[in-house]
Structure formats: C-alpha cells, structure tokens
C-alpha cells in the first residue's frame, strides 16, 4: 500500500485531503497538534490504514521523532508528503503587528515545512515519481493590505517549492506548489483570533472555495502518469480576481 503524510490533518484542507486520498486507496499518516480531532477523524476513515500522531511542526526534534517512529511497513512506502500545516495570525499594518504572531506564522509556515521536508525526503527517494505537495496561498504570489508577514511566509513557500524542484530533479521526486485563494475553513477564525463575526465577513457576497476543492485538486496531481509533473497551481473562487479583488453580490 502507498502511504501519504499529511500535516495539519485535523481540520480544513488536511481533513478533506485525508478523506479524498483514502478513496484513492492511499494509507494515511496524519499529523496535527489536536490529537482528539485526529482520533475522531481516524474513526471515520474506515477504508484505509490510518496512522495518527500529535505533532507541532514548529518543533524540529518532534518532527524527526515522529518520522523515525513510523512503523517499518509505513516508512518503507511513503509516496507523498503534503505540507498542509499553516496559518495566518492577525491582519494589519506591520508597525501595529505583534512579534509573537510573526514568529508563529514563520515557524509554522516556513520552518515547519522545512523540518518536515528534510525528514521525509529520504523516504520519498526510495520511490521514483513520488510527490512533495506544498500548500502555499495566493498570498505567495502577490501581497495585499495587512498581509505583510503572512504574505512573506507564503512567498517563502513558493520559493522553497521552486528550489526543491531543482534539488529533487535527479531523485525523480515531483514537487507541486498549490496557491489557493479564498477558502472557507477555520483559516479566518484563526487569523482573527476567534472573532467569528469578522471571519464570516471575509466570505460574504460570493461563494468561496471549500476544502474539498483543494482535496480534489491534490487527487488530480497524484493521479498523473509518471512523465507528468504539475509544478504549480493557483486556484481561486470564480468571484476572485487576485488576492484582494472580489465580485461580491
């Protein structure tokens, strides 16, 4: 059985990706900070072999331990790494920002992705045409008002994806960068620190992406033949033109 590692798997994109890959016949390695949610998800994913572990990707030693602790039958059959864990915290001018928020975003979105990729790539090397899929953002393609550090972190993901594609070319590992636009998940609740009213307004007047849209995109990427590599995908709602312009009704 082929296995896929998914970070940030307890909700949003990660949860939907797990469900979609189960339907493709993948075994699943699911990492997230909230083990209770992973346990609930594991009970629902009855079609596949599902391995779960609590993990904060900001902790390099914990990342290394989680990968080294994988059972042999799983570690020998890792065919995909999906670096999904990420977040935005706060939105406003840089001079009004909080360094704790900056560190949380950089440590999760950038350093966490690096730690996980560094630990898992040696497992992917065993399987030609395996995948690293990085969840970036439209914020990794452009910047918007109040996005400063979050946009910077996702620009870093975009750059790391391009660099990995060079680094892993001779190892025959495919690297894809996915840049979603506005998607209705817990993202805005986290960004606005639990302010549900402000978070809801983000999606008013148009139909945003759903987590399932991203999961289906990843299923398409993984299902391409060996000679086809999807390098970069920007996916937005039909009502979105760029990082900040929407056709709201």
Describe every region a protein language model picked out.
Residues 10-11:
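Conserved glycine-rich cofactor-binding loop
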Residues 26-40:
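Conserved glycine-rich Rossmann-like NAD(P)H-binding loop of the short-chain dehydrogenase/reductase
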Residues 54-66, 99:
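The beta1-alpha1 cofactor-binding region of Rossmann-like NAD(H)/NADP(H)-dependent oxidoreductases
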Residues 92-94, 101-104:
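Substrate-binding pocket helix/loop in short-chain dehydrogenase/reductase
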Residues 117, 153:
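Active-site helix of classical SDR
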Residues 137:
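Residue(s) in the substrate-gating loop at a strand-loop-helix junction
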Residues 177-178, 197-244:
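C-terminal helical subdomain
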């Amino acid at each position: 059985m082929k296995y896929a590692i998914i970070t940030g798997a307890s909700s949003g994109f990660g949860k939907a990706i797990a469900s979609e890959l189960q339907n493709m016949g993948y075994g699943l390695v699911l990492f997230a900070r909230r083990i209770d949610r992973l346990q609930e998800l594991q009970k629902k994913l009855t079609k596949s072999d599902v391995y779960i572990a609590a993990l904060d990707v900001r902790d390099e030693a914990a990342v290394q331990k989680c990968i080294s602790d994988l059972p042999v039958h799983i570690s020998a059959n890792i065919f995909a790494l999906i670096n999904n864990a990420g977040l935005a915290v706060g939105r406003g001018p840089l001079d009004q920002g909080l360094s704790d928020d900056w560190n949380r975003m950089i440590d999760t979105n950038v350093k966490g992705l690096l730690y996980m990729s560094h630990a898992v790539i040696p497992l992917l090397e065993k399987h030609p045409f395996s995948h690293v899929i990085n969840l970036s953002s439209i914020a990794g393609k452009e910047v918007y008002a109040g996005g400063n550090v979050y946009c910077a972190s996702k620009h870093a993901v975009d750059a790391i994806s391009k660099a990995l594609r060079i680094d892993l070319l001779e190892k025959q590992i495919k690297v894809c960068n996915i840049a979603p636009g506005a998607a209705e998940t817990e993202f805005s609740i986290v960004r606005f620190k639990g302010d549900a009213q402000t978070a809801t307004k983000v999606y008013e007047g148009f139909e945003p992406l759903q987590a399932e849209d991203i999961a289906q995109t990843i299923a398409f990427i993984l299902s391409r033949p060996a000679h086809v590599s999807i390098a970069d995908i920007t996916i937005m709602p039909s009502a979105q033109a760029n990082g900040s312009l929407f056709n709201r009704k």
